[in-house]
């Protein structure tokens, strides 16, 4: 049996073996077979990476680089990602099971993030503040915070790392990335492109490993000035506590249990497809998944029939195949979690009207059929807890007020969808839904230009758009006395 390919950490522009010599296998979720080994990072590896990032941050080659030049490097990187898109897309499909055609589309849009922040890099600026007197000049500077620790998830490794890297680098920071232990390959494939784009060594570093062994030391390291994390709300809380103890900032993009609300005047065909896209795309493994489908009683039966009819015909199988519409869940633990929630939902009184089982695919991977529940109450655990899989609950409502009450009755507040032809209703719903993103007659639309934030336990801080620059900069106020008059004795009062 041939040994698996091994990948080391990427630190200071070099492939670096793990300090303690350990490696761990990563599994292809479509086959349930290991396909490479990654370095098992420890506190010593994190310390080395943070040291490299701190050195790069203070190096004149990066510190004194003009903002315009930083923007050029980001544009170079975006172009290189476009050049390597097929390789990166295939790597991520093998690593987390997303459809290859979905990854190709994602990689086609990924350069836009770097190009957008390339254009923003030389527009990060302070302002002049009107002073108390003509002799006092007061202005502000917006400076990089320093070394950013970025901990990224397994569901969309490249995209969700890009949303952190691009603005952090545009602002002049250096970064240490700790990808999920389940999906390190695409980040390791991306890493050498930073130096090829012209970034000095150490500006971007990648340390692989498990959360407690590498992620924990990264958030606790004295050399890290800011932490950004995407993942579960439970882990996010622990990171927030660590950052609070250290008095450093953190940006958290966490879980969701998003409502997708359909009114009787909606285009029901489009709404049903919006439900399908909202919960079954990427096997439901998206933080904004529209897992709670709320349908007005007047059209409940019709919408349910449309949704279940399409869900039952979704083609499940090899994510590399062009005809496949639903790939596997990314990890074995997630498959077990989805199965346990489906069992729980039935025990709570819910009825499975579609799916609810592992499908026959001819593969040994972590596949689960698109599943639709009826007969559920919003107080049930399957309606309140994030499942992170292809499981939807379809619940009726009778009025706008009732829809809002159900939608907002959640610990989460990441996103919401509204389907209606009534533009006044759209505005009313958007104003009262407790969610950081509201979509009307669409779902899962994204752009690097549009800010994204989570309400309640769905997160803290902002990603995307111009607002995110505040997350990666600190504000400095500068006062200058321009008067040529000699300073007087401060203890003599003057009228």
Question: What are the language-model segments listed below?
Answer:
Residues 1-30, 56:
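Hydrophobic face of amphipathic alpha-helices that form TPR/SEL1-like repeat modules
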Residues 13, 32, 70, 92, ...:
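Residue-level signal for inorganic ion chemistry
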Residues 17-19, 23-24, 40-44, 266:
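A short acidic/small-residue loop/turn micro-motif
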Residues 31-37, 224, 261, 315, ...:
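Conserved C-terminal structural/oligomerization subdomain of aldehyde/semialdehyde dehydrogenase
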Residues 33-124:
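Glycine-rich loop-to-alpha-helix module at the N-terminal edge of alpha/beta enzyme cores
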Residues 57, 61, 78-85, 89, ...:
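Structural signal for hydrophobic packing residues in well-ordered secondary-structure cores
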Residues 126-270, 397:
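Rossmann-like NAD(P) dinucleotide-binding subdomain of oxidoreductase/dehydrogenase enzymes
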